[in-house]
Structures are given as C-alpha cells and as structure tokens.
Amino acid sequence: MISTSDFRTGLTVEIDNDVYQIIEFQHVKPGKGAAFVRTKMRNMRTGAVIERTFNPNEKLAPARIERQEVQYLYNDGESYNMMNMETYDQFTVSKADMGDAIKWLKENMTLTIASFNGNIIAVDLPNTVELAVVETAPGIKGDTASGGGKPATLETGAVINVPFFVNIGDVLQVDTRTGNYVKRV
C-alpha cells in the first residue's frame, strides 16, 4: 500500500479498479483543521484528468502495470501486429488501444506497451522518430522573411508544420510527444 506521504509525480495507483497516474500533488496544512493531500490524476485508460483530495492517513494500492518492449510489424487494416521482443510472440493491438500513436508508427519500430490486468492502457513511442515528407508545397525564394512554416504530410499520413526549406523526400526528425518538427536529418 502507498501512503499519501509517498506520492510523487508519475506514480501510478489503483482506485476503483482503474489506473491513475499522478500529474500534480500538493500537501496542504491549513491553519485550522486537518492536513490533506490535493492531487490531479490522469485516468490511464480514458485519458480523463480528475482532481481528488485524500486524507493524510489514507493508503492506496499501487497499480501493477506490466510494460513490454515490442516491435511494430504491420497493419492488417483493422489492427496492428506486434512482436514481443523477449519471447518473440506475435499479437495484435486494436486501433482504439493504439490511440494517437498511429500517426507516428513505422514498420519495425520499437515501442513499449503498458498493460493493466491484461488490458492495454498506454502505448509509449520513442521521443523522436525519423519520417520522410511525401507531400508539401515547394519553398519559394523570400518565404523565410515572414517566418512561420508550411504543412507537410509525412509517410505515416501525419500532417505537421515545417519550415519553408523542407522539400518532398526530406527525412525529418519529429517529436512524438508534441508532434513538432525537430530537425532535418
């Protein structure tokens, strides 16, 4: 059991058969009355953020999250086929379970899947991926004077904003957490 005094940002706890990750927490000691811990937590399944207050003597169960390193093999239209890097077992992951990770998936990419009670709750991608530009407007001389950028479609179908000097065929490094252009590779 985890005491509220042991709360840390990023800690995962189980509340009502759901997994929550602590985003923020604050120990509050009012001048009058008992102390308490105010938290902001994200539901790992739904992504919803809730605020909850706990008594200082309250104890919570730690969430037993299993993480496995997998390799993305291919998409068969309805689901995404993965291979466990330790056991080499192949399995499928539904489009809903993949979430926003679909935008950055490239065949043979290594990623981490987190599961709770056998259900996938999170797909963790590398912080950056390298993807080729398949469609963008050509850069015109003098465009850079105004700054800004232009939209570009990547090989996975994701559309991001890139600087004017980027052309079709360029390989870019993209931050998967924010969806921002990092640099040309």
Swiss-Prot record:
Question: Which Gene Ontology cellular component terms are annotated?
Answer: cytoplasm
The protein's UniProt keywords, in alphabetical order, are:
Cytoplasm, Elongation factor, Protein biosynthesis
Q: Which InterPro entries match?
A: Elong-fact-P_C (IPR015365), NA-bd_OB-fold (IPR012340), Rib_uL2_dom2 (IPR014722), Transl_elong_fac_P/YeiP (IPR020599), Transl_elong_KOW-like (IPR013185), Transl_elong_P/YeiP_cen (IPR001059), Transl_elong_P/YeiP_CS (IPR013852), Transl_elongation_fac_P (IPR011768)
Query: What is its subcellular localisation?
Result: Cytoplasm
MF terms in GO: translation elongation factor activity
- Per the UniProt entry, what are the Gene Ontology biological process annotations, in alphabetical order? peptide biosynthetic process
Q: Name one Pfam family in it.
A: EFP_N
Xref: SUPFAM superfamilies: Nucleic acid-binding proteins, Translation proteins SH3-like domain
Q: Say where the protein is mainly found.
A: cytoplasm
Keyword Protein biosynthesis belongs to the record: yes
Q: In which pathway does it act?
A: Protein biosynthesis; polypeptide chain elongation
Q: What does this protein do?
A: Involved in peptide bond synthesis. Stimulates efficient translation and peptide-bond synthesis on native or reconstituted 70S ribosomes in vitro. Probably functions indirectly by altering the affinity of the ribosome for aminoacyl-tRNA, thus increasing their reactivity as acceptors for peptidyl transferase.
Q: Which family does it belong to?
A: Belongs to the elongation factor P family.
Q: What NCBIfam families does the annotation carry? A: efp, PRK00529.1
The protein in question is named Elongation factor P
Source organism per UniProt: Desulforamulus reducens (strain ATCC BAA-1160 / DSM 100696 / MI-1)
- Gene from which this protein is expressed: efp
